[in-house]
A protein has these predicted regions:
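Helix-turn-helix
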Residues: 4, 8-50
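Solvent-exposed, amphipathic alpha-helical segments
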Residues: 4-12, 90, 104-107, 162-169
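Hydrophobic alpha-helical connector segments
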Residues: 46, 59-101, 148-159
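Short amphipathic alpha-helical interaction/hinge segments
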Residues: 55-59, 99, 116, 163-171
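Amphipathic alpha-helical packing segments from all-alpha helical-bundle domains
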Residues: 82, 96-109, 113-143
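Hydrophobic/aromatic-rich alpha-helical bundle segments in the mid-to-C-terminal region
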Residues: 120-124, 128, 142-171
């Protein structure tokens, strides 16, 4: 159900897809779909939770904090540059090759222009969120190495921009 709904959201946009359309695509009735999910928003929330869960797993596997700095500042002070590189590679493969991640990203890209909520989510997941995360990691790495970075924000932009560009080109 989630994969089918997300595929439809990625092609037509979240707002344009009805529960009836999802049920029709699956060959089931709306009533059968409502036995699993309360509504379309519930389906979206389950998709988002799954995407977040996978992000936590990739973070742990790569040795980087799985939450924001405000939630676990101590974890940011122990990250190695290699761990950040490994994480970014894993992120690129995930966001460019995984069917769920690709469709989630495509849906957010479409919906960011139609809804302030989706625009904020797009920023958090794909633009300002990763940028702030990388900036915080770079700041903590420089503290540990006792080196002052001229502009952690500018360095984070330089680090993240190729990732974002290549991700956009992968479509």
């Amino acid at each position: 159900i989630l994969v089918t709904a997300l595929r439809l959201f990625a092609v037509y946009g979240y707002e344009a897809v009805s529960v009836s359309r999802i049920a029709g695509e699956l060959g089931i009735t709306k009533g059968a779909l409502y036995k699993h999910y309360k509504n379309k928003r519930d389906i979206f929330n389950c998709i988002f939770e799954y995407v977040c869960q996978l992000d936590v797993e990739r973070s742990r596997k790569s040795g980087v904090p799985e939450q924001d700095y405000s939630d676990m500042p101590e974890a940011f002070s122990h990250v190695l540059p290699k761990s950040l590189g490994d994480y970014m590679k894993a992120q690129f493969h995930y966001w460019s090759e995984d069917e769920i991640a690709c469709n989630f990203r495509k849906m957010l890209t479409l919906e960011q222009y139609k809804s302030s909520e989706m625009s904020a989510l797009y920023q958090k997941v794909l633009v300002s969120g990763p940028l702030e995360y990388i900036e915080r990691l770079l700041c903590e790495m420089s503290k540990r190495q006792k080196k002052q970075l001229p502009s952690p924000h500018a360095l984070a932009i330089e680090f993240y921009s190729p990732f974002y560009l290549l991700l956009s080109m992968s479509d």
